[in-house]
Amino acid sequence: MTTRTEAVKAYLLDLQDRICAALETEDGGARFIEDAWTRPAGGGGRTRVIGDGAVIEKGGVNFSHVFGSGLPPSASAHRPELAGRGFEALGVSLVIHPHNPHVPTSHANVRFFIAEKEGEEPVWWFGGGFDLTPYYGNIDDCVHWHRVAERACAPFGADVYPRYKAWCDSYFHIKHRNEPRGIGGLFFDDLNEWDFDTSFAFMRAIGDAYIEAYLPIVQRRKAAAYTAQQREFQEFRRGRYVEFNLVYDRGTLFGLQSGGRTESILMSLPPQVRWGYDWKAEPGSEEARLTEYFLQDRDWLAASN
């Protein structure tokens, strides 16, 4: 493991600790359970799960560090020159599914890949981002989420937030439904256009921004009253989350194709979901407004003006 990889690993382990501590404090009841694991083909990780809390119905904050002699197809398909290289992949990935339909589901991920081949320069890149999936939309929450994202990106250039915001909107799109998974945030991958130190600093800025972006929303919404009908709608919308993760998500595909730990990879799935045949929201309802207004590619910073 190189000095660079050691620095990334130390940051990611600390990030996992800090996020878990903040979420436990906010929940006020449940605690994370850690499951340390090793990967027979090389590497391992720390899976931390939380559930049946006062706020969090199910969540996980995972750290993994895996390595192998060749990249799986999901990682090399869009960069065929990497085929046959040994690799190391480190990351923290998290998903939080709250009980209350008024509290959005959140997802965040930061990761580092390095691919090496004897006699050639190592190829490295960073990836990550965070995105929000509301069930009952709130403009203030969307604006806050994107404002934190913009602030995290600002030191790295005025074009960074709009570029990675647009990439997030494009990436988290459920093609067979022709709708976005949520209201977006940031997404970046294959990041090596800056030098290593700047790229690493950017990954840290995004990782550190997650709690600042999410917890104020949780605090505002966690005590809101909700009905059984609203809970059913939350479970219906969770079905879209499952569809995206199992069909399109690059991290899920990479994990399964590289012989990753199935329990950790599928940790992102919600605990209760429902599907209804050709279900449609009642016109003019809050449920209809979710798709008509909130689940659109929108400039949320402009919405605050």
UniProtKB/Swiss-Prot annotation:
Q: Which SUPFAM superfamilies match?
A: Coproporphyrinogen III oxidase
Q: In which pathway does it act?
A: Porphyrin-containing compound metabolism; protoporphyrin-IX biosynthesis; protoporphyrinogen-IX from coproporphyrinogen-III (O2 route): step 1/1
Q: Which UniProt keywords apply?
A: Cytoplasm, Heme biosynthesis, Metal-binding, Oxidoreductase, Porphyrin biosynthesis
- Give one Pfam family, short name only: Coprogen_oxidas
Binding of a divalent metal cation, residues: H97, H107, H146, H176
The region called Important for dimerization is annotated at 241-276
Residues binding substrate, per UniProt: S93, N109, V110, R111, G259, G260, R261
Q: Name one GO molecular function term.
A: protein homodimerization activity
User: What biological-process terms (Gene Ontology) are attached?
Assistant: protoporphyrinogen IX biosynthetic process
Residues forming the catalytic site: H107 (proton donor)
Keyword Metal-binding in record = yes
Instruction: Indicate where this protein resides in the cell.
Output: Cytoplasm
What the entry lists under InterPro entries is as follows: Coprogen_oxidase_aer, Coprogen_oxidase_aer_sf, Coprogen_oxidase_CS
Q: Which GO terms describe its cellular component?
A: cytoplasm
Q: Where is the site described as Important for dimerization found in this chain?
A: H176
Q: Which co-factors does it depend on?
A: a divalent metal cation
Record-listed E.C. numbers = 1.3.3.3
Family assignment from sequence similarity: Belongs to the aerobic coproporphyrinogen-III oxidase family.
Query: What does this protein's UniProt record list under function?
Result: Involved in the heme biosynthesis. Catalyzes the aerobic oxidative decarboxylation of propionate groups of rings A and B of coproporphyrinogen-III to yield the vinyl groups in protoporphyrinogen-IX.
Name the chain's protein.
Oxygen-dependent coproporphyrinogen-III oxidase
- Native organism is Pseudomonas fluorescens (strain ATCC BAA-477 / NRRL B-23932 / Pf-5)
